């Protein structure tokens, strides 16, 4: 059994405040993780319900135990892109608030065997969904050509000079059986050594980010789930999403703009209004105090919109 609350919830107070929770409302946490946000949502419910979704088996196992005495909680184990497919089995199909937290949990980062971190030696895995049918990060490095890997690093890590990194990683894979996360990290650092300003930890993090995003199809999944949000929300229901890097942010900003802005065609006699409105004109950022206690939240941004 996992230890209690192995992950600190990001922007917790801001999320709970902006969900505008009603005691009899129905709420959906599409990235329930280890139940941090969801626990606080539940505290404000009387006759309302909470539905939690996560693709991480450890998270669902933890939350099943955490919420075992809660009759108003339902958990779904799947990629949130597939959540819409589960509606037929659920009693609640429309929600008063939906939350997506796109961050990788501290538990995933700190557990070496999950392979997300370059701080600890472990298998180069990085799977959010630990199914045998899902390839690992190591599988991806083996399958992709040097040219394809270069493209992945540039597109999903926004990495300058990705070619020598890709070349070095392919050489590592060809010459080393089952290299660890630390060996992958050392290879990246060595390949980047000719580019003085790219020796930083941030550069290494971007390489790991690129492979993780590609492996787990994160941006593709985000695009799919965003298409379903308007259909899942009740009128006056709110959608909250926390992003952590520029690729997510760009996708979310474009999505929100389309839902909250409408160009009135001059030939239409009836004035049309967009289906959603912005609750916060600018994204909500972590406080200095939160960043001090949990440095991993420093890049987090919370967007909030409401269905009219």
Curated annotation (Swiss-Prot):
Positions of S-adenosyl-L-methionine binding: 35-37, 54, 80, 101, 108
Listed GO biological process terms: rRNA base methylation
Catalytic activity field: cytidine(1402) in 16S rRNA + S-adenosyl-L-methionine = N(4)-methylcytidine(1402) in 16S rRNA + S-adenosyl-L-homocysteine + H(+)
EC number: 2.1.1.199
GO MF, one example: rRNA (cytosine-N4-)-methyltransferase activity
Protein's name according to its UniProt entry: Ribosomal RNA small subunit methyltransferase H
Alphabetical list of HAMAP family matching this protein: 16SrRNA_methyltr_H
UniProt record similarity statement: Belongs to the methyltransferase superfamily. RsmH family.
């Amino acid at each position: 059994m996992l230890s209690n609350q192995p992950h600190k919830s990001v922007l917790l107070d801001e999320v709970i405040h902006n969900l505008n929770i009603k005691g009899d409302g129905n709420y959906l946490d599409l990235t329930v993780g280890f139940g941090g946000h969801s626990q606080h949502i539940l505290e404000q419910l009387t006759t309302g319900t909470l539905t939690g979704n996560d693709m991480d088996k450890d998270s669902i196992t933890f939350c099943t135990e955490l919420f075992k005495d809660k009759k108003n909680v339902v958990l779904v184990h799947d990629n949130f892109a597939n959540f819409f497919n589960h509606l037929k089995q659920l009693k609640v199909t429309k929600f008063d608030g939906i939350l997506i937290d796109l961050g990788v949990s501290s538990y995933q980062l700190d557990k070496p065997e999950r392979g997300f971190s370059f701080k600890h030696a472990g298998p180069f895995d990085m799977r959010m969904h630990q199914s045998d049918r899902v390839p690992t990060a190591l599988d991806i490095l083996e399958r992709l050509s040097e040219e394809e890997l270069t493209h992945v690093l540039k597109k999903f890590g926004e990495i300058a000079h990705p070619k020598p990194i890709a070349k070095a990683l392919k050489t590592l894979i060809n010459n080393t059986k089952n290299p660890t996360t630390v060996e992958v990290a050392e290879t990246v650092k060595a390949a980047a050594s000719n580019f003085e300003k790219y020796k930083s930890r941030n550069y290494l993090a971007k390489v790991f980010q690129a492979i993780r995003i590609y492996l787990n199809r994160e941006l593709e999944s985000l695009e799919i789930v965003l298409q379903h949000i308007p259909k899942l929300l009740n009128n006056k229901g709110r959608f909250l999403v926390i992003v952590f890097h520029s690729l997510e942010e760009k996708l979310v900003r474009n999505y929100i703009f389309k839902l909250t802005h409408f160009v009135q065609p001059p030939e239409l006699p009836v004035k049309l209004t967009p289906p959603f409105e912005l609750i916060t004109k600018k994204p909500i950022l972590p406080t200095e105090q939160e960043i001090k206690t949990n440095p991993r939240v420093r890049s987090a941004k919370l967007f909030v919109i409401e269905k009219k």
